Amino acid sequence: MLNYETIINGASSALNIVSRALGYRVPLAKSLALVAGSCVVYKIIVHRRTLVAFLVIGPYATVVQHRLPMALQRAIIEYTREDREISLFPQNSIVSAEHARKADNGHPISGGTRDVARETISLAIRAAGFRHYEISPARQSPAEAASHQHYAAADLVRAATEDKIQDGDVVVAIDIDYYLRDIDRYLGRGVPFMAYTFNPVEVAGRDGDSFFRITNNQVTFDVSGGGSWSHEVWDWCAFGEFIETRDASWLAWFARAVGLTKSQIHKVHYCRPWPQSPHRALVWCLPVASYWRFTFIPTDLHTRTLRRVRYQDTSRPGWNSIVSTGSEGLNISLGREGADHCVTIPKVHYDMLMGLSSAQSLSSRMIGLKYTDPSVLATVAQYYQGKNVEVADADRIGRAINPKVHWPAHVEVDEAEVSARVYASPLVSDENMMPMIKRWETLSLSLDRRVTFQRNPKVPGKRLRAYAIEFVDLVVPERGVGVPYSLEDTAAMLDKPSQTLAIQQVWETVDMPPRRLIEAFVKNEPTMKAGRIISSFADMRFLLRFSSYTLAFRDQVLHAEHNRHWFCPGLTPEQIATKVVDYVSGVEEPSEGDFSNFDGTVSEWLQRHVMNAVYLRYFNHRAQRDLRSYTDMLVSCPARAKRFGFAYDAGVGVKSGSPTTCDLNTVCNGFLQYCSIRMTHPELTPIDAFRLIGLAFGDDSLFERRFAKNYAKVSAEVGMVLKIERFDPAQGITFLARVYPDPYTSTTSFQDPLRTWRKLHLTTRDPTIPLATAAIDRVEGYLVTDGLSPLTGAYCRMVKRVYEAGGAEDAAKRRSRKSHSREKPYWLTVGGAWPQDVKDVDLMFQCAAARTGVDLETLRSLDQRLGEITDVWADITINRDNEPNPYKDTLDLEGPADGRVDDRVFQNDKHVMRLRANQVTSSQAGAAGSGDASNDPNAHDRGSQRQQGSASVLRVPDRAAPAGVSSDEQPAHQTASRSSASRGGAGPGRGGRRRPGPPAKTTAGGARDGNQARAPTSGPSKRQAEGRSRSSRGPAGSRGRGK
């Protein structure tokens, strides 16, 4: 056995011989490194087979020309290699293939995909038991450690930090790997690396809702609502599964000075799981091994190093090209540098086409290969000729942020139509939607959800019937003494400009009987479900004459001393706030009453025996004949769609356009409270129970907690749904959508935060009014009523400050418009501002945090940031995607918003829509005669009253219905066939296409004797009708593609 000294001396001599043979003049440092490396020879000698493996060339070719250097490289790799293999399967954690943000920030699809990628990566890391280490994490990132400095404005939401990367970490890069100047700094730590990255398979185009192009091998990515980013791209998706990086430790850095380096080997995996963003990839690099090697001796290990992707075409200057693998083989994408257009064709076609001798041959072959798109033919021909033109680099304007649209599943339209605009980024991600009020299917859905499905036929038991008599007598102590106001006095009280104009139009015929007709439309306001119905009475005579009773009753009875303690309509905000504090301070524990669809669930019994009964008891017998006819119209009245003309059953519920709505809803609310008091304390006299009624304003109420159980029980007995909210001091108490953080001692209140934040960024002003003007006018009102409210006040100040600095119209010009106050808060226009005390600001913040679930520090930070922002489109949206979905009866980008699909409900909605469509078209045909009427249910919106006016009158006549048909029934007209209509029931210019051919004829005549349809006297044969029905497509049989 040789001793160690002999081995060292022999090794040194051998190295000198090798150096001279190779022509190396090895410096002392390198000689020492080689000598140190040769120390392993002692161990090798006793392992002959290993020594042979190092010296033989082996079955494959080697990159080292001499055996001894080859053996030394192999030896140091062998004895320093370290197995670092780790298993990680992020594909098991992919949460969604398609996702879009709830809030439209200009790029909801791209942003939503990034959110899903971030969640997928985080879930995969946590599931495998690793620590999440992220480079430049976003505000919503769940990273436990980070490398974070301030490069972009969005980085300022986190403090700068540089945590140490440790074993057990996974380094994460979300859409930022392109900017890393030294990728080895992270991969060289020998830990897993995961990235959500952009790696396009085309040289220009669209990714999600953003566009990109490539110039000089740099991708320019334009993001609406974001920035324009320019960067190179790493070749994560190139061939070669193993990548080699230099170790990032200090020892390896010093060792490189003497010719040694430590290498880290990672295996690269990637997938593209997001169809809406085909150019995005989820990349994960898992460590496999590490080893030391000599830097000056080549190695036989086959790995690759990361490099930047080269898009410039080597054979065509000014052009880009990239080859990718598709489901049917290789594809090549071709496009000019800096252009937004590119074409993608199979690589085998490209190889064949580029070998042709002339451009004419190329065009002929492409046509033979079934290429018919002129843009493809022209682009490939230009590429073949090598034609290069300068691409114009014009300034670009991003897509405007649009309101979120309430989109019922059965709406047959391709593009949304809403009458609203967004003037700033929303405060919360679950913002309000806007209804498509110009679509008749929207009205049909609202009628079903808010009228038809809410019918309440219940009659309460004997006890409640007795309480009703007591309550009416207590509200109106004296019977038959009331006298209505004169019409002149009433007209003076109805002083809104629209009311004044309408009264002037009917004043000369005011003595004529009013027309029995309700016209319904969907209110153009933010919503979370089917839009609210406004049931307006078409004849101003009815409103004027009925108001003479309702206004007198309010002034003389409801505002009388005995009703003042519970009846709140007509009070100013300061009076209401004082009343809330007085009431809460005087009871043991207050509670809130929250009715579900109050108007729709009011029964006929409640209308006749409680709500209308107080009017009829008060006014004298001379006035009762007219008054009874008016109150009867509140219960039963013909109705039609104002914009579209189809008839519907308005039901017996409260009609929102009636002059009694607020007052009688309050009376109904007070009655339910009275009944609950009588049931809880039957020993009380009626007058004592009446004095215990809480605060009531429409369907809002504040009531003692001790009556809550019977309050809910009474509501259920009369067919209404009541939810009682128990008072939580941390969340304050709510009345009239105002939150009182300390109702025992302070009148300070602020608008319900979540309800306000969801709609604060929207305006429904006329689109001809400049957006800046509409925005300032809207927020000025909030600054008066809620200037100190958490976030609301700061947001409104930010909007006003930014738009005024941007050159908005001056105040005098803005206030000269008649619609200047159209979007001012209601209370500002009728009674002034709600009281707010500066000393209660902190309390309001704490209360808002408790009510919304948003961290208090987050609210304070955002409120402060709003005071510094200079861009209304800055990213300020609070992410609430983890909260329960608040939307109903609508589609979003991922399907039904609530995640459920009930085919029965969908088919029923379609069926009702078809019935109403046939009703409209058949009545139009009956009125117009020989088939020249429009078959478009939306025709009323396009000035077609001339054609349809007579049909509308016949459908809903003024006179009473004949025996056997109640006046509130709306029988459908009979039709022999479905009439042809535009796609989705919409005419040209509204998302539909006009079908060729004449409109189908119907045999329905005009209605007579009320709303009963007249049977046809003659018509086509059964065979003709069936044939015509098969050949036509009305809204009932429309096959237009939905959303």
Swiss-Prot record:
Question: CDD domains from the entry?
Answer: ps-ssRNAv_Nodaviridae_RdRp
Cofactors, names only: Mn(2+)
Q: Give the UniProt keywords, A-Z.
A: Host membrane, Host mitochondrion, Host mitochondrion outer membrane, Membrane, Nucleotide-binding, Nucleotidyltransferase, RNA-directed RNA polymerase, Transferase, Transmembrane, Transmembrane helix, Viral RNA replication
* One of the GO BP terms on file: DNA-templated transcription
Active site as annotated: 699 (for rdrp/tntase activity)
Ranges where the RdRp catalytic domain occurs: 588-713
Q: Which InterPro entries match?
A: DNA/RNA_pol_sf, Noda_Vmethyltr_dom, RNA-dir_pol_C, RNA-dir_pol_PSvirus
Assembly mode: Homododecamer. Forms 2 stacked rings of 35-nm in diameter, arranged in a crown-like structure at the opening of virus-induced replication vesicles. Interacts with protein B2.
The UniProt GO MF terms for this protein read: nucleotide binding; RNA binding; RNA-directed RNA polymerase activity
Q: What is its EC number?
A: 2.7.7.48
Its membrane topology: Single-pass membrane protein
Among the Pfam families in the record, one is Noda_Vmethyltr
Which reaction equations make up its catalytic activity?
A: RNA(n) + a ribonucleoside 5'-triphosphate = RNA(n+1) + diphosphate
- Recorded family membership: Belongs to the nodaviridae RNA polymerase family.
Chain residue ranges for the region called Cytoplasmic: 43-1043
- Domain text: The N-terminus is important for both membrane association and mitochondrial localization. It may also contain a RNA methyltransferase (MTase-GTase) capping domain. The C-terminus contains the RNA-dependent RNA polymerase domain and a structurally disordered region at the very end.
Q: What class of enzyme is it?
A: transferase
Q: Where is the composition biased (Low complexity)?
A: 922-934, 1032-1043
Annotated spans, Capping: 105-291
Q: What else is known?
A: The viral bipartite genome is composed of RNA1 and RNA2.
Q: Which GO terms describe its cellular component?
A: host cell mitochondrial outer membrane; membrane
Q: Which residues cross the membrane?
A: 26-42
Job of this protein: RNA-dependent RNA polymerase, which replicates the viral genome composed of 2 RNA segments, RNA1 and RNA2. Does not need an exogenous primer. Also possesses a terminal nucleotidyl transferase (TNTase) activity. The TNTase catalyzes the addition of nucleotide to the 3'-end of plus- and minus-stranded RNAs, probably to repair the 3'-end nucleotide loss. Forms the open necked connection to the cytosol of the virus-induced replication vesicles. Mediates viral RNA1 recruitment.
Q: Where in the cell is it found?
A: Host mitochondrion outer membrane
What is this protein called in UniProt? RNA-directed RNA polymerase
Start and end residues of each stretch annotated as Disordered: 879-902, 918-1043
